[in-house]
Amino acid sequence: MLTEVAKNIYKQVVPLPNNPLREINVYFILGEKNLMIDTGFNRRECEEALKSAVSELGIEEYDVFISHLHSDHCGLISKFAKSGCKILAGETEGEMINFESGNLYWRMLDDLFIKFGFPEAQFGRNTDIHPGRKYCNTEKVNFTYVDEGDVLEYGG
């Protein structure tokens, strides 16, 4: 559901099916330059909710700002990057998101869990059922990094 929360600022509720969080809010700032903040999981339902909002708002070009690296906020970024959106994030967030997009991060995490006492039969290689892993971004993205003190000019 798309709601105007302030002049030229809209909130789209994005479903997170079968997840205790149930949903996240994605924001759109409209003006001469448009910005979408966060994307939801890498799931069809999230993508459809965002496509619906973009269509309803009548925008064709927009950038995407990622608030943080959790996959419920950045899962779809490679799809938006491929469609021509500029993807903005802090450098640490962007580097970690790209690191998580491959298998090395998840193998290292599995190994740490085992090292610190989680029985492999109960957890270990089963981290693939965790939604943070299951619905994460799957491809590296060329980020535009933002830093503390940077001013982003969107809306109008």
What are these regions (language model features)?
Residues R22-E23, E139, G155:
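Short, basic and Ser/Thr-rich N-terminal targeting/leader segments
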Residues K11, F28, D147-G156:
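Core dinuclear metal-dependent hydrolase active-site scaffold
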Residues L2-L57:
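Conserved beta-strand hairpin/beta-sheet module of binuclear metal-dependent hydrolase folds
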Residues E45, S52-D150:
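Active-site HxH/HxHxD metal-binding segment of metal-dependent hydrolases
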